[in-house]
């Protein structure tokens, strides 16, 4: 089974990806892991990626696409199938993935989209606070400290609501064309992500069993 998982930051995509890998035995292909492995193994694309990263520059699409292609061509993919996580990030990368899969004789079986209302995600992501003395992390709503005094806690700049909203807006703008592309191919299953982790996975599992 060859899958793609999508979802906004804070939707719980990483948690569900880990559960899918555990339950269905597919190879988990996350962009971060892929880059690290390609650079460690000094593949052609890995060396290219490292040259950009070392200069503090963004890795161009063609290099990212090349690293994905290298990984998808490995033997375990034909045996186990894959779960792509964190790629494609742009519609151009989605088109490149289509071409790569066709070239390798592979087919995408489904796209799992973990849906959570952005307003809920802002609450999830912007509630994080850190104790100034101990460095411990808490959440204002979901895991509040027992003896909360505002002056004892601070919030990281990228956890502030306005920053979180900007980040979500960018992700929505990038993600919508990709989802639309796969919807036209009849591949997308939307999963309600604003429920307990076990309930989300029950819905994911049901959708994937129907694909088999």
Curated annotation (Swiss-Prot):
One of its GO terms (cellular component) is cytoplasm. It is found in: Cytoplasm. Keywords: ATP-binding, Cytoplasm, Kinase, Nucleotide biosynthesis, Nucleotide-binding, Transferase. ATP binds at residues 10-15, 128, 137-138, 195. SUPFAM superfamilies: P-loop containing nucleoside triphosphate hydrolases (SSF52540). Coiled coil: none annotated. PROSITE patterns: ADENYLATE_KINASE. Pathway: Purine metabolism; AMP biosynthesis via salvage pathway; AMP from ADP: step 1/1. The keyword ATP-binding applies. Residues 127-159 are annotated as: LID. GO terms for biological process: AMP salvage. Its EC number is 2.7.4.3. Monomer. Belongs to the adenylate kinase family. This is Adenylate kinase. It comes from Streptococcus agalactiae serotype V (strain ATCC BAA-611 / 2603 V/R).
């Amino acid at each position: 089974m060859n899958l793609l998982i999508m979802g906004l930051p804070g939707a719980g995509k990483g948690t569900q990806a880990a559960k899918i890998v555990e339950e269905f035995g597919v190879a988990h292909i996350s962009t971060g892991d892929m880059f690290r492995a390609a650079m460690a193994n000094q593949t052609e694309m890995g060396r290219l990626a490292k040259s950009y990263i070392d200069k503090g520059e963004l890795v161009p699409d063609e290099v990212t696409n090349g690293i994905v292609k290298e990984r998808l061509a490995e033997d375990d993919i034909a045996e186990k199938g894959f779960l792509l996580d964190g790629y494609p990030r742009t519609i151009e990368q989605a088109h490149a993935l289509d071409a790569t899969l066709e070239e390798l004789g592979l087919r995408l079986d489904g796209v799992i989209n973990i849906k959570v209302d952005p307003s809920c995600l802002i609450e999830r992501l912007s509630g994080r606070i850190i104790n100034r003395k101990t460095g411990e992390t808490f959440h204002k709503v979901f895991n509040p400290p027992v003896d909360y005094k505002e002056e004892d806690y601070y919030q990281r700049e990228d956890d502030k609501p306005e920053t979180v909203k900007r980040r979500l807006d960018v992700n929505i703008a990038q993600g919508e064309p990709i989802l639309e592309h796969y919807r036209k191919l009849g591949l997308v299953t939307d999963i309600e992500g604003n429920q307990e982790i076990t309930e989300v996975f029950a819905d994911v599992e049901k959708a994937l069993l129907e694909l088999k």
